Amino acid sequence: MTHEPPSHPATELLPPPKPPLAFRVGIVGHRPNRLQAADMALLAGTLRGLLRAVQDEVMEVARSQAALFSNGLPVLRAVSPLAEGTDRLFAEQALALGWDLCCVMPFPQAEYEKDFVGEAAQEPDSLKRFRSILREAAQSGRLNCLQLDGVRTGGNDSDLYGTGGKGVLGLSDMLIVVWDGDTMQDKKGGTAETWVAARDAGVPVVAVDAKAPHHWPMPVVPGGLACLADVRQAVRDAMESKIKAPEPAATALLPAVRVLSEDATDLPAREVLDWRVLFPDRPPEVGP
């Protein structure tokens, strides 16, 4: 009796899953002590209009580049430290539009929350509002938190808050800056410094006047994104600069997607992967 050798299925290459299309907008701005000339309802509307313009353009890019990305809705993420004032107003508008929220805290949460109680607080029920925003995002599965390991020294903690601002910038494809134009009150690590860092990094910036009626770009700032059409074009430019055409996968990646034969024989690959990358697509997934 003769035995036929076992047959082996042909090697099958599985394409990697397509990434979601993603865009992230960060915020830096003033706390209530520098928003005394603001109309908060009007400022909220301005921020909401900017976010909606970004959202509309991302959806348009998703339609035009559908072959490159997963079939789900694009990921839209607001990046905010949730400090009192501008940060929270921005986050609330983003959540109302269905965006995800990434909260970048300059300290571990328990330490950061000390900014929102007692004499340190500048808003009524400040800690309650902070936690309420986090809870709203978490309950809908739209929250990421990045808690930095800043340690207060009892002196000037500007560098620690500045590190938080750099974290926001590093996780943002576009930055909205709400500034009052008063350079005399600017502090190290504050709004203006993060703005300069964004400019140096080539991140598109929308500069909104912290004073009513909240013009943008601010009258004191030449150039910049001057209208919603500019904002939408900046979104498209930022996204298209990160979309790579399909290219052969690295050899090291092939074993991860190759279906091996029953006896684990590593057959030569006869195809290349259809590999598409959008980078960066998501911030670190850190629990609240």
Model-derived regions, located:
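Acidic/glycine-enriched connector segments
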Residues: 2-244
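Non-membrane alpha-helical secondary structure
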Residues: 39, 227, 245, 249-252, ...
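Charged, amphipathic alpha-helical linkers/stalks
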Residues: 235-262
